[in-house]
Amino acid sequence: MYTSGYANRSSSFPTTTHNAARTATENAAAGLVSEVVYHEDQPMMAQLLLLPLLRQLGQQSRWQLWLTPQQKLSREWVQSSGLPLTKVMQISQLAPRHTLESMIRALRTGNYSVVIGWMTEELTEEEHASLVEAAKVGNAVGFIMRPVRAHALPRRQHSGLKIHSNLYH
């Protein structure tokens, strides 16, 4: 979760109080699974909306897992975005059909603060419920990145977000 510089300032509260407040903030997002649907013509939206949350989650001691569709994350982009390079793990999925199961397993372990996976199809209610349950068990956040085909109209209104292709090399 993004907090302003004012909220991140030093305070006179004892360390245990500060740690309890930080843990409460981090736990507020636990169990969250959100789908980010994007169009190719909106490359900056994901950076504007997701990066503050990813930076905040990067302050935890746990990993951030990116399940990407055959592209490799750019080391330079990770560093320039303010994400903790030493906590970012990436697995390039050769078969997109395995992304859902990989996300569920990773979320459930509790080893990751966030798991980001790319899917080509809309999730069923049952698949979404499985992800939410796994995120709750692992006290984690899941993001499903899903491109919308230009010729296909979504069944319901979605937000349009995209992580720009310059993130990969």
Curated annotation (Swiss-Prot):
Pfam families per UniProt: SulA
Post-translational modification: Is rapidly cleaved and degraded by the Lon protease once DNA damage is repaired.
Region described as Lon protease binding: 162-169
Positions of region (FtsZ binding): 106-112
Induction: By DNA damage, as part of the SOS response.
Record keyword Transit peptide present: no
Keyword tags: Cell cycle, Cell division, DNA damage, Septation, SOS response
Coiled-coil stretches noted in the UniProt entry, renumbered to this chain: none
Functional summary from the UniProt entry: Component of the SOS system and an inhibitor of cell division. Accumulation of SulA causes rapid cessation of cell division and the appearance of long, non-septate filaments. In the presence of GTP, binds a polymerization-competent form of FtsZ in a 1:1 ratio, thus inhibiting FtsZ polymerization and therefore preventing it from participating in the assembly of the Z ring. This mechanism prevents the premature segregation of damaged DNA to daughter cells during cell division.
Family: Belongs to the SulA family.
Self-association state and partner proteins as the record states: Interacts with FtsZ.
Protein name per UniProt: Cell division inhibitor SulA
Species for this entry: Salmonella typhimurium (strain LT2 / SGSC1412 / ATCC 700720)
